[in-house]
Regions:
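Structured loops at beta-to-helix junctions and adjacent beta-edge loops in soluble globular domains
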Residues: 110-111, 139
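Flexible, low-complexity linker and terminal segments
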Residues: 124-353
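Flexible loop/turn segments at secondary-structure boundaries
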Residues: 1-5, 28-30, 52-55, 77-81, ...
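Structured ligand/cofactor/substrate-binding pocket environments in proteins
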Residues: 67, 115, 123
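Thiamine diphosphate
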Residues: 1-105, 109-110, 341-353
Length: 353
């Protein structure tokens, strides 16, 4: 389903002075994207299914070498070839923790057509500020959707620091306060007569290869600090529905429409319930833990498998990050988009269960 992005950009990007490169395979594509960024050209690559798995080694390399980059993964039903023309939200775990070693990634998601326009700008801002690859999770449902939208804000930037605050706020973000780097003493290539060293080996602040224990520990601490910089800039997503309800339904990505409509339908029927939708799915806001612990029950609605014994990927992530007893209310892995009726029925069944 990532082909829809390729088709659109092949038509439109050359008009804006850009170019589209269709590489021979997924590994070459992500390598070309990182090489372009190293040369000073903002770039991104798109993929789906097993192609996202093939990109993981280069994404780990980019984290170690502090190369910016943006990857859009249009999720489909899996694993393996699975159902290429069906939708799912089952790549969350690989997006966050898919590379070997200890290096969680920053992950954004899109809920609708408008988000697809703005998400790459936010991802570019994060990637260039923190010098790290950013993943945007879409899915087949969004990638093949059409919608009438308001006029888009132009986000052509010479300097990502000039990104509009309201664009960041779509993803619950404020401008980053700090930009921790492993190699603060290295110049960008082409901007200095100094040598710019780049490697996947562990290095010190000058870019020199180092096997020293304290250097390795500091590099890990800096990578974690990049996550914390995003975490500290994140606001808890706005509550939709009854702010005094004891039950909270959480979703992310393309589940927003069905989630909000279900909450509204339940409220009209006298059910006190609230909804929360996440655009930034990792890291999560610092204040989220206390918010979730303020509810009697917290559930997720996901287009990924989950049941009473096996929490869905997003429920598992919320548990891991907040130590809150989050359970999966709807864990739908049918290949079909979530509907409000599915969520409403699950809430009613739970109330009588």
């Amino acid at each position: 389903p990532a082909s829809s992005i390729l088709h659109a950009l092949a038509h439109d990007l050359p008009r804006c002075g850009g170019m589209v490169h269709q590489a021979e395979d997924e590994i070459a594509a992500v390598g070309a994207m990182l090489g372009a960024y190293f040369g000073g050209t903002p770039s991104f690559t798109v993929t789906s299914g097993p192609g996202f798995s093939l990109k993981q080694e280069f994404l780990g390399y980019a984290q170690m070498a502090e190369l910016p980059g943006v990857v859009v993964d249009v999720q489909r039903a899996g694993p393996s070839t699975g159902m290429p023309t069906k939708t799912e939200q089952s790549d969350l775990e690989i997006a966050v923790h898919g590379r070997h070693g200890q290096n969680a990634a920053i992950v954004l998601s899109v809920a609708n057509v408008s988000d697809c326009f703005y998400a790459p700008h936010v991802a570019r801002y994060l990637a260039e500020t923190l010098r790290t690859p950013i993943t945007i999770l879409s899915d087949f449902h969004v990638a093949n959707s059409f919608g009438v939208v308001n006029e888009m804000r132009s986000c052509q930037l010479d300097d990502v620091a000039d990104i509009a605050t309201d664009v960041l706020e779509r993803f619950d973000l404020q401008p980053l306060a700090v930009a921790p780097l492993i190699h603060p003493n290295q110049a960008a290539p082409g901007h200095s007569p100094d040598m710019r060293r780049i490697t996947g080996l562990n290095t010190d602040s000058e870019g020199s290869i180092s096997y020293r224990a304290e250097t390795a520990q500091q590099a890990h601490a800096t990578r974690v600090a990049k996550l914390d910089a995003v975490r500290d800039a994140l606001a808890v997503p706005t509550i939709h529905g009854d702010t005094a309800a004891g039950v909270l339904l959480c979703g992310w990505g393309s589940s927003r429409g069905a989630l909000y409509e279900a909450v509204d339908e339940l409220a009209a029927a006298g059910v006190r319930i609230a909804g929360m939708h996440f655009h930034t799915v990792f890291p999560l806001p610092q204040a989220l833990t206390s918010v979730l612990h303020g509810y009697d029950q917290v559930f997720t609605v996901e287009q990924a498998y989950g049941d009473a014994r096996h929490p869905g990927p997003f429920a598992a992530l919320l548990r891991q990050e907040t130590a809150c007893d989050v359970r999966t209310l709807v864990g739908q892995a049918t290949g079909r988009p979530l509907t409000p009726g599915t969520i409403v029925d699950a809430v009613k069944e739970g109330a009588h269960g």
